[in-house]
Amino acid sequence: MYSKEVQKLLDKLKTEVGDRIQIIKDKKTFEGILMPRIEMGDLNSIVLKLDNGYNIGIKFEKGVKINKIKKEWSVTKKKIEPSKKLIFDKKLPNISIIGTGGTIASKIDYRSGGVYASFSPDDIVMQIPELKEIANMQTNEIMNIMSEDMTPEKWIDIAKAVAKEINSGIKGVLITHGTDTLHYTSAALSFMLRDLPVPVALVGAQRSSDRGSSDTVMNIACAANFVANSNVAEICTVMHGTMNDDYCLAVRGTKSRKMHTSRRDAFRPINELPIAKIFWKDRHIEITNDDYRRRNDKKVLVDDKIESKVALVKIYPGIDPEIFDYYLKKKYRGFVIEGTGLGHVSTFGEKSLLSSIEKIIELDIPVVMTSQCIYGRVHPFVYHPLRVLSSKGVIYAEDMLSETAYVKLMWVLGHAKKLDEIKKMMLTNYAGEITNRVISNSFLI
């Protein structure tokens, strides 16, 4: 909504969003489509979409004149329905697509310029007829949200949906998901789904599915090929491997991270090589890391006991030690500290965190240390302050990603309460989250 003054004039002119209007200001005339006000925009700035496609804002003030020209379009959105049903070859493997939302399930409203959730898994499949040559597939939309709205409780819903599909005899599962928190979900599923017998691929898109530059088609085609035909029984992310449309990377779910806000090849393996390259055109799957779980005949188990009151705290110069008091008052049960370098926090400075950390551990609340460097591993013995923190009970999480450690601590706290048990579980490699040795050619790939 615009300001009361602007809205009063629009109502008087019987003008609404979608109408073509003319605005005269300072002897200049502007003509275009009246747009909704940007949510965080100025209440008195009228937004026009010009005929060239650009939006402009015009400040409404004394002397500004508005004329209605005609009604141009309605803002009412109708649900997109699949136009036809794809027919698959019964000789091909059966896979399942589970929809959770995100950009991959969104389209642009070019009139307003916004992206909104629109496509169901069925809609996406309809855009990719080549899928009928890869596998038979069934679709199930369990939610349609942008990934910033994902919660630990929704991870459990996804895990249960995946397990149900797998235990029905499906050969692989593809999960469509928003990219921003996709690696949190991939880590969560890696811990919650035990004895995984088939591949599970989380796939997203950096560009909405109706755009010419969308990465949806290639990402889904590669992910479908991966879960249908590979011998990998792991939770993986499957996204563009380069800026070009040549191949996707299958990256272990606990070692994958979004490393760019908008590039199509944003998801990279951290501290290890990707498990596979999946080539789009010829559908060749090249294994690039032989350390993976193979397909098997086990029944997947859902282990969804978690404690969601875990905080992920980033260390920065001047951080106030009292920030931890807030979390303690909120009864948080665990902390992952993203320290500097090898796992440092201010230990002997004027804003030392040492006493705050000691207080937390004395309450039998675990403190886990990761590095904001992303690559490499933390180490409790290289410098004296690190030794001090370690002696107080801080758990140094090897080369775990901060996001993975955050999710893992939730899962561990669902199974252990004593600090020694928690430490043992945090340092046990359950889903490839810890590598014994970080190889040099795993950096920036």
Indicate where each model-derived feature is located.
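Conserved RNA-binding domains used in RNP assembly and mRNA/RNA metabolism
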Residues: 1-88
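ATP/NTP phosphate-donor binding region
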Residues: 8-9, 55, 65-67, 74-164
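Accessory alpha-helical/coil subdomains and C-terminal extensions
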Residues: 98-99, 109, 118-121, 126-131, ...
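Interaction/scaffold regions that mediate signaling and macromolecular assembly across diverse proteins
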Residues: 139, 379-419
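Catalytic-core regions built around general acid/base machinery
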Residues: 164, 195, 351-367
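Short acidic, glycine-rich surface-loop motifs adjacent to enzyme active sites
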Residues: 167-182, 330-344
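Short Gly/Thr/Asp-enriched flexible loops that form oxyanion-binding sites at enzyme active sites
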Residues: 175-198, 347-356
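Internal gly/pro-rich beta-alpha loop/helix module
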Residues: 203-280
